[in-house]
Design a protein with these regions (language model features):
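Carbohydrate-associated surface elements
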Residues: 175, 197
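Active-site proximal beta-strand in glycosyltransferases
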Residues: 3-4, 107, 122-142
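Short N-terminal targeting/anchoring amphipathic segment
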Residues: 97-114, 118, 128
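Membrane-proximal helix-turn-helix segments that form the acceptor-binding/catalytic region
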Residues: 150-169
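Nucleotide-activated donor-dependent transferases that construct or modify glycoconjugates
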Residues: 1-21
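Acidic anion/phosphate-binding donor-loop and adjacent secondary structure
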Residues: 198-206
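A conserved catalytic-core segment of Leloir-type glycosyltransferases
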Residues: 5, 9-11, 30, 34-104
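Short beta-strand scaffold positions
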Residues: 109, 171-172
Length: 206
């Protein structure tokens, strides 16, 4: 099986601790590694943010790769500006797959912007999409301390669009499942709860 993993706005190999680097980066990287252990080939597609970084990086083991796809300026950009380049990102993934002669059996997208790209790939490749949001705009707005912290309609509408399109939505917890159902009206038959795993080689009793 070949999986196209999408992490549009942040690279799973990025240094942790920045504004847009943290749990999702670790999740995508470790999930990709573990799928490789099971003999599943994964290409993780992310937007190129540095022209000096090789576009294809073999750093996730078992032949799995991170592919940096040019989409807009190859520099870090604020999230609202990133949305502009999602169509270019999807088009260049399609071109990459065609040039390499790769057929992907499944798309697994992370965060809502990756989901928008996944919808374009799904239309081209006719394969199912599994989506994980990691955070939800409406939930963030509920706990925002100021207007500046609130997410705009472009994100909320984008999330709803992705929820309608996805074949399955992964929730990490029952609480997240409830948020998807009650805040967005997602059918519970579309949601599957898969709790994040633990790397027992790193976390163990002492």
């Amino acid at each position: 099986m070949n999986i196209a993993m999408l992490s549009y706005h942040t690279c799973p190999l990025a240094t942790l601790g920045g504004k847009d680097t943290g749990g999702m980066n670790v999740y995508v990287a470790e999930l990709t590694r573990q799928l490789g252990v099971d003999g599943i080939h994964v290409d993780v597609f992310t937007r190129s943010q540095d022209e000096h970084v090789p576009h294809v990086v073999h750093s996730l083991g078992y032949g799995n790769r991170v592919v940096h796809i040019p989409a807009g300026p190859e520099v870090p950009l604020p999230k609202p500006e990133l949305a502009t380049y999602i169509p270019t990102f999807a088009e260049n993934i399609i071109r990459f797959a065609a040039e390499k002669g790769i057929h992907y059996d499944l798309i697994h997208s992370h965060y809502w912007m990756s989901g928008i790209a996944a919808e374009m790939l799904k239309a081209e490749w006719k394969v199912p999409v599994i989506q994980m949001f990691h955070t939800l705009g409406l939930m963030k707005n509920r706990i925002a301390q100021s207007e500046e912290e609130k997410e705009g309609d472009y994100r909320i509408n984008g999330e709803r669009q992705v929820m309608r399109m996805a074949d399955r939505i992964v929730a990490a917890t029952q609480a997240e499942e409830a948020q998807l159902e009650f805040l967005y009206g997602v059918d519970d038959q579309k949601i599957v709860i898969i709790p994040p795993g633990v790397d027992v080689s790193r976390f163990y009793p002492i």
